[in-house]
């Protein structure tokens, strides 16, 4: 299900003295089945942008097309319920939205709300809890007896139980330790590959953006600043830093090595493994001569 933003603008509290423009002239497409990252400094418009994907926000100008659904300025979209079934959104700290007596009831809430029978919803809950790497035995427990990481996985299972075609992730690993962050990101990538889900990730973690995303959209002051593959985007390191966007750690190390040893590493290195390989290649080609001079 392809998603397209066409000249989208969004203003909060439009036509009031408190009006604030959050998005303008946003033209971007997310073809079906891809893995995308949206990055940018705080306040760049990332979260406002993704709230247009399932009709939580409506453009002030322009159109957002999600598959067969059109959300346009001044026109009320009548079929938001089927749209919200197809576009699952995992907001920051989704565990704060848990409220039912048991894990099973919490996961079943979404499917039953969309008209699925109780028995079918229970089956979906069993499938979803296994997708997020939890044991089915937890279905009978209160979600509030679980660890923070388990609660987050339960909340994500509630989104997956609705079998969305698009999964939107807004800082999904916020507050987790490094091990938990890595496990969750690997889980999302596995779902993307095995289920063919379109994934749109909003993140401040540049390592995750570089590692997982096929295309990266850089937002700045409410509009698209850059778009391309990780290699293309992070080749503009100086420009990114000027607008407050961090760089992957491997690029920071690359710069430090170049400055310290007086060598040039031409290729953008987006992982420490890539960096190690490129340093070895440069030294083999005679880059060590620069080091000794």
Curated annotation (Swiss-Prot):
GO terms for molecular function: ATP binding; ATP hydrolysis activity; ATPase-coupled transmembrane transporter activity. Residues 3-246 form the ABC transporter domain. ATP binds at residues 40-47. Gene3D superfamilies: P-loop containing nucleotide triphosphate hydrolases. This is Energy-coupling factor transporter ATP-binding protein EcfA2. Its EC number is 7.-.-.-. ATP-binding (A) component of a common energy-coupling factor (ECF) ABC-transporter complex. Unlike classic ABC transporters this ECF transporter provides the energy necessary to transport a number of different substrates. CDD domains: ABC_cobalt_CbiO_domain1. It holds the Pfam family ABC_tran. Signal peptide: none annotated. Keywords: ATP-binding, Cell membrane, Membrane, Nucleotide-binding, Translocase, Transport. PANTHER family: ENERGY-COUPLING FACTOR TRANSPORTER ATP-BINDING PROTEIN ECFA2, HEAVY METAL TRANSPORTER. Coiled coil: none annotated. Forms a stable energy-coupling factor (ECF) transporter complex composed of 2 membrane-embedded substrate-binding proteins (S component), 2 ATP-binding proteins (A component) and 2 transmembrane proteins (T component). It is found in: Cell membrane. GO terms for cellular component: ATP-binding cassette (ABC) transporter complex. Belongs to the ABC transporter superfamily. Energy-coupling factor EcfA family. It is an enzyme of class 7 (translocase). It comes from the Bacteria. It is a peripheral membrane protein. Transmembrane segments: none annotated. InterPro entries: AAA+_ATPase, ABC_transporter-like_ATP-bd, ABC_transporter-like_CS, ABC_transpr_CbiO/EcfA_su, ECF_ABC_transporter_ATP-bd, EcfA2, P-loop_NTPase.
């Amino acid at each position: 299900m392809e998603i397209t933003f066409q000249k989208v603008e969004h203003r909060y509290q439009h036509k009031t003295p408190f009006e604030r423009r959050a998005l303008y002239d946003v033209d971007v497409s997310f073809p079906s089945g891809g893995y995308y990252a949206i990055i940018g400094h705080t306040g760049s418009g990332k979260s406002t942008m993704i709230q247009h994907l399932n009709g939580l926000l409506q453009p002030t100008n322009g159109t957002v097309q999600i598959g067969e659904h059109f959300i346009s300025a001044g026109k009320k979209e009548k079929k938001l319920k089927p749209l919200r079934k197809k576009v699952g959104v995992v907001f920051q700290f989704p565990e704060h939205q848990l409220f039912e007596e048991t894990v099973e009831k919490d996961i079943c809430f979404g499917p039953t709300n969309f008209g699925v029978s109780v028995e079918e919803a229970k089956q979906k809950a069993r499938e979803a809890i296994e997708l997020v790497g939890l044991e089915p035995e937890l279905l009978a427990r209160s979600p509030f007896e679980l660890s923070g990481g388990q609660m987050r996985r339960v909340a994500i299972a509630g989104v997956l139980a609705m079998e969305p075609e698009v999964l939107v992730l807004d800082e999904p690993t916020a507050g987790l330790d490094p091990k938990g962050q890595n496990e969750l990101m690997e889980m999302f990538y596995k779902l993307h590959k095995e289920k063919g889900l379109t994934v749109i990730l909003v993140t401040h973690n540049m390592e995750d953006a570089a590692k997982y995303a096929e295309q990266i959209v850089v937002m700045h002051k409410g509009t698209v600043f850059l778009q391309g593959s990780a290699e293309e985007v992070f080749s503009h390191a100086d420009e990114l830093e000027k607008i407050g966007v961090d760089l992957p750690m491997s690029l920071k190390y690359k710069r430090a090595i170049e400055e310290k040893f007086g060598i040039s590493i031409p290729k953008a290195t987006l992982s420490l493994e890539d960096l190690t390989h490129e340093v070895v290649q440069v030294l083999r080609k005679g880059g060590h001569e620069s080091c000794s001079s």
